[in-house]
Amino acid sequence: FRKALAEVLARGGTALIPVFVMGRAQEILVLLGQLKREGAIPMDVPIYTAGSMRAIAEIYDDTRTTTPRVNPDDQVFGVEQHRVPYEAEAKREILDGPGIMVVSSGMMFEPTLANVLARRMVENEEDGVLLVGHPADGTPARRLLDAARADGPGAPVMLADGHGPQPVHCTVERFRFSGHSDRQDLLSIVERLAPEQVLLVHGVH
């Protein structure tokens, strides 16, 4: 992720990071702050966010010392963020890059901001879409990833009804940021709650 992001920014492109608004968005923003402090990406590269993730981020920061955290010193707003503008012309200006867009939805459903921005970036070889969640089958995020992987540069993709197909020239990569509890996490919850009965339910359908 670090390498791919740095490469997009180095060539003057914009990196689109589609995220789920609660949990993954805040995790990515904290990580971006760390990458800036480490010098992995430029300190002055702008980071843009939008929507309810900003309100949720405030709650994360306000409760960082009263809820269990790996590092209570990490703050979502510890890294400077700019609000994605509403105006179409202003959006075009910030896409001139370099920059980082952390917006929802993680699956890039239409008409979310992630979908709107992806349609404006997909034909630009300087830009990159970095997927940090599992793109479910049939979603725009999955269609974009499959097109880029299967057919390479110029492969057609339909990201929204009435728009496209568009040729994929931007970088598209997927990174495995797990949002699930591991075995020890699940066991510790059961041990703390000590319930009389535990029901295990899992399945896509």
What is the meaning of each model-derived region?
Residues 1-205:
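Acidic/His-rich, metal-assisted hydrolase cores and their charged scaffolds
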